[in-house]
Amino acid sequence: MAPARKFFVGGNWKMNGRKNNLGELINTLNAAKLPADTEVVCAPPTAYIDFARQKLDPKIAVAAQNCYKVANGAFTGEIGPGMIKDLGATWVVLGHSERRHVFGESDELIGQKVAHALAEGLGVIACIGEKLDEREAGITEKVVFEQTKVIADNVKDWNKVVLAYEPVWAIGTGKTATPQQAQEVHEKLRGWLKTHVPEAVAHSTRIIYGGSVTGATCKELASQPDVDGFRVSGASLKPEFVDIINAK
């Protein structure tokens, strides 16, 4: 029997916080009883990666919220994977809907970033998800499969990749996909993986859900067989993040 997938909870602090209130949040996380069989990763703003890594309990990993597709160069405002590692972070979030739709990042660029980050030794939380008009048009599968294919084409070793399904219509809106909606897409994503990567990889790759996850909604979502964890934004800045980490 294949081993169970380790539950994964990632907090995305986005462009929020200052040292004083992030320090309070970190103290709350450090003092909390967290399950040993759940992997926890926090993604602070780039300016606070070093601060978070120094203050957080070592069992909680740190991620960057973005990186570029090359190591160095004349790319004002960007950060390379090697720099991220130098700050003590071990993960990077790529393909978030805000990077896609606010900053205009293409599937191709996201794929290039994934390839470079993995080559440099970072773990990648790769985000995919449809917009509301795409869901209403009945093309959710088409959209997320196309996004996943570009990511898969750039992955050689899936051990350091987590797929995050984040329906854009549920991010920061207070709307959450029902457990059934989340499970349906996660199950189809795993089915897509089974036909495009080795079956063992399809089984072991974690597919997590993001989109207005709260302490009130997390337990039922976590009970779904193909929901392997969460990406949490607003609630990750609040004490209820501890409840979400303990959802499984």
From Swiss-Prot:
One of its GO terms (cellular component) is cytosol. The modification N6-succinyllysine is found at K149, K156, K194. One of its GO terms (biological process) is glyceraldehyde-3-phosphate biosynthetic process. GO terms for molecular function: methylglyoxal synthase activity; protein homodimerization activity; triose-phosphate isomerase activity. The modification 3'-nitrotyrosine is found at Y68, Y209. There is a cross-link at K142 (Glycyl lysine isopeptide (Lys-Gly) (interchain with G-Cter in SUMO1)). The modification Phosphothreonine is found at T173, T214. Pathway: Carbohydrate degradation; glycolysis; D-glyceraldehyde 3-phosphate from glycerone phosphate: step 1/1; Carbohydrate biosynthesis; gluconeogenesis. It is found in: Cytoplasm. It comes from the Eukaryota. Its EC number is 5.3.1.1, 4.2.3.3. Triosephosphate isomerase is an extremely efficient metabolic enzyme that catalyzes the interconversion between dihydroxyacetone phosphate (DHAP) and D-glyceraldehyde-3-phosphate (G3P) in glycolysis and gluconeogenesis. HAMAP family: TIM_B. This is Triosephosphate isomerase. It comes from Sus scrofa. The gene is TPI1.
